[in-house]
């Protein structure tokens, strides 16, 4: 297929280089091959990559250099841009610390001197320059952030099915994996909130394949939220994946769900000669059935119909648009009307036909479920500014006009964009803001509608754990006609709410609480030794200034015949180039894993070891750019077992200052945190103190 260049490429005065992706598809192994060989660590490779292939743009973002690399996909003939924004970190940087490191458990890492945003924007933004808010949006086709020490985060992966030349989620993910392999990244984290329509892929693929969707690229379990550990996660996977299909049919026989389930299972069992003995076998085959060509599915349906009674069965219809995304800031824009909801909107002054019912009943709920980087309180304050504009104008307002009208009172354009994208999903008192498209200009516009008392009644009855809608009364269809609907039926009625079994439902919740996954790369340069050098502060500094876990060592490449003296020089150069706190650090000695000091003239290779400790002086203990998680020490000790920030909503005890999950303390997501909060221990101490005072009196 011929390469199709987009407008931004052809408008360039100088023809830029195009990096052709010859194998832009899933490779046979789970680890994708590099584009080409770079023989250095990430901090050096990223510089070489930019120097060789990138074109520097004529604008900056908050002083950060923006470069563009053009890539050509031979899979679908598309040339697309990869923007790389290099942020130099200093005390004056707008966002020098990393919230993603803090939430992932890397808050003890030293603050790096450079970090690189790697962005493939949406297709309709390829001709536009990036903006400041581009660094916080999660609607890009791809957005990754990598620190110059090689640790990074995959923030989002999205697909645009409306684009005929769209890049699939698998293609984008394969590109990202190969890019990381090429540049020699060390570890990449991600927050897995990927979905297929209404289904969480980490649950669906976890049961079907024993791994999340990202597991195809070797992303492995890191830690769970709410204190979930690795062994509990794997037990939950095993519990659900090993459910026997015959047991399901037996336990549900005689029920309406059982009859529907049997028709689905009989069809797919009749479509293969392989025994579909377990739920894992069944779901894996059904997921493969989706990828078959329509003619193959129709043939299978005809063959099965010859051996089975042809029946229709009820199932739940759902949006079949696929979206795969990740990060603490993920956004999803689904404007389809969800049939089956019984929420009624009512505005006596305007028509309400086709208005989408609200998905959330508070901004706290929206903030949590849409993974907003802004708390519910800020979203609510911003929404009030939007309502004020509607009250002043009393008319339908275009998106651009509304955005400009609230900028003076809100200021944060990223917050404005996020709110306008999701505001139609939330009730604001007895009103809701409707998004629609102007039929003439085709531009997005907003209007304010009033809802009736029935919605308010639904809001009062809404509980935290809302079970999925019963699906036995929904639209009829035929097994195999829509494999997605067949899978969704099993997902809703087996994985989420297995009848009369708390064991299986709890196992599903354990898997859903596990969103943090990580991939680690390892490599060794040819004709060089690559060793890890970890800074070891002196005893006084450890007691006074470096109370957290020491960050991992940095990779240092030296010749194979290097001595300890040469390693000292190379390590000092690497540390000064990488971290703010080691900018003036001088290496005095190298120690082995047993903390034994090594002589300068000793051959490095003779040590038979690749991990060393580095001691010296010159650590900048006065800088606030010490830890990626921030300068302040704070303690998490929740009753669920969590001992670190896991990205979930928390509240600090006003007495002991220890942080706890709000949900673990009966504070619902749509509830405000009380003005005074005491944890169970401090509350008990307070009661005992009051009793003592009363007894003394």
From Swiss-Prot:
The keyword Transcription regulation applies. GO terms for cellular component: nucleus. One of its GO terms (molecular function) is zinc ion binding. It holds the Pfam family PHD. It comes from the Eukaryota. Residues 339-349 have a biased composition (Basic and acidic residues). A zinc finger (PHD-type) spans 635-685. InterPro entries: Zinc_finger_PHD-type_CS, Znf_FYVE_PHD, Znf_PHD, Znf_PHD-finger, Znf_RING/FYVE/PHD. PANTHER family: BINDING PROTEIN, PUTATIVE-RELATED, PHD FINGER PROTEIN MALE MEIOCYTE DEATH 1-RELATED. This is PHD finger protein At2g01810. It comes from Arabidopsis thaliana (Mouse-ear cress).
